[in-house]
Amino acid sequence: MYNRKKRLFLTAVCLSLGLLTGCNVGDTKNYKQAAQDLEQGNYEAALEEYETAISEGVKPAQSYRGAGVAKLKLGNYEEAITYFNDALKCDKVGKALKKDILSYRAVAYLKVKDYEAALEDCQTLAENYKMDADLYFLTGETALAMDSYEEASANFEQAYGEDATYDRAIQIYGAYLNRDMEADGTRYLEAALSGTAKNAEDHCDRGRVYYYMDDYENAESELKQAIDGDNTEALVLLGMVYMDKGDSANAKAMFQQYVSQAENGAKGFNGLALCDIEDGDYDSALSDIESGIHVAGAEDMQSLLFNEIVVYEKKLDF
């Protein structure tokens, strides 16, 4: 049995996807479309367009960088590193762009467990740029991977001090969770709950925090308030709460509601598949996964394909 909470942290680091300008309109058609696809999560299309831009010599540094980000998002970490290296070798790599590339390359190095290389990039960033919440988090995550717990803690504290948001607290918690150090991350969740909700999005975030803390009663209360405020994402989270409580019927109802309301119902189909797996209805799970795959972006696709493997393992039907 796999840990559903850990599956929610496939993407641990949130980094800027800022775009730089230049060149004439005709030359940048593929580049601009690639940037749009990258922002929208259409990573395979973005990769193809960036590769076309590279072959045409359009914005080489930015195009190599974009292709690297697409490869990173698609889970091709070694190839991502190669693209980032190529980007850094280009002429006229501005300071802001270099910071962006080094940050992404450090993430890729973490993914392939080349912690020394990741640390070297973090040190370069610290020496040449003003530290911000993202860089503190990245440095903390690298230190944690290298079992430098005190250094990790110090950097995470700096990250949260710079950006005391629900998302940052959840991100730090996720880093600890992925290292089986959940208790160390829980204090950030507790800190995030010290404020009050101002809108439906806040209620959704608070519900997510309570869910990670296994406080299902408060999670349910917050998420219902978010749903009353027309927050669609809260439907998926409430479905997960019901699943963990063993209430498959209500979980399915939430996931079905999400499928009917969301622009992209992939998360809802994935949730329905999880319910079917729990119920032992593997054929229905495969049907839901297939429906989800038809509408999924790259990140949802990873989860759907993972669950498809789980179903086939349970069916013993390879």
Features from the language model and the residues they span:
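Short coil turns that delineate tetratricopeptide repeat
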Residues: 58, 92, 96, 129-130, ...
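Canonical tetratricopeptide repeat
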Residues: 66, 73, 97-104, 138, ...
